[in-house]
């Protein structure tokens, strides 16, 4: 139960960070389907904003964005990446997002990233950012993860509490790349 409770905390941390990334004013415009050129455009915008290309760039994307990128030979081929999307056996069974490494960036596919439009919608937002552009802090000393059993009432319980916060530190270090994933929505 404590593990499940901490999973809830971790998802809340993700949502806080995504909420701050969404406040960036740098974007690539209207939502279209993703491809290699669009990703390279985002990378170029970061470079033009003097963001250091030091291995600390992350691209957080939706499952629909990943699906479109899998159709790009540059992304899915072993010839172009050291840590590609097919390097992990059965990633769906892991309780954390899988990290790919491509174009000098960490790629994280996150199922709860949608920019408010819902999964596989025409308004998905993905974020390309430098590590120093976003901050997240929590009070580790006050983190509580407790579980127990009440014999009198015959029920189990779990509770986690944490004091935390996220903040966009450098707006120019984040690029919002809107993606149209509507063609992959369930019928």
Where are the regions a protein language model picked out?
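Long, contiguous amphipathic alpha-helices that act as assembly "spine/axial" helices in icosahedral shell
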Residues: 1-26, 30, 38, 48-63, ...
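Extended, solvent-exposed, turn-rich assembly/linker loops in the middle of proteins
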Residues: 21-97
């Amino acid at each position: 139960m404590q593990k499940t409770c901490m999973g809830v905390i971790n998802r809340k941390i993700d949502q806080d960070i995504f909420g701050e990334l969404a406040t960036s004013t740098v974007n690539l415009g209207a939502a279209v389907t993703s491809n290699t050129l669009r990703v390279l455009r985002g990378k170029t915008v970061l470079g033009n904003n003097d963001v250091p290309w030091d291995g600390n760039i992350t691209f957080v994307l939706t499952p629909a964005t990943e699906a479109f990128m899998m159709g790009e030979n540059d992304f899915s081929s072993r010839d172009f990446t050291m840590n590609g999307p097919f390097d992990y056996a059965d990633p769906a069974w892991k309780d954390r997002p899988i990290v790919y490494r491509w174009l000098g960036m960490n790629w994280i596919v996150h199922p709860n990233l949608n920019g408010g439009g819902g999964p596989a919608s025409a308004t998905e937002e993905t974020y390309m950012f430098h590590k120093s552009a976003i901050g997240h802090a929590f009070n580790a000393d006050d983190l509580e993860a407790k579980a127990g059993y009440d014999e009198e009432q015959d029920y189990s319980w779990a509770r986690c509490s944490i004091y935390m916060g996220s903040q966009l530190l450098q707006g120019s270090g984040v690029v919002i790349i809107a993606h149209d994933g509507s063609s992959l929505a369930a019928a």
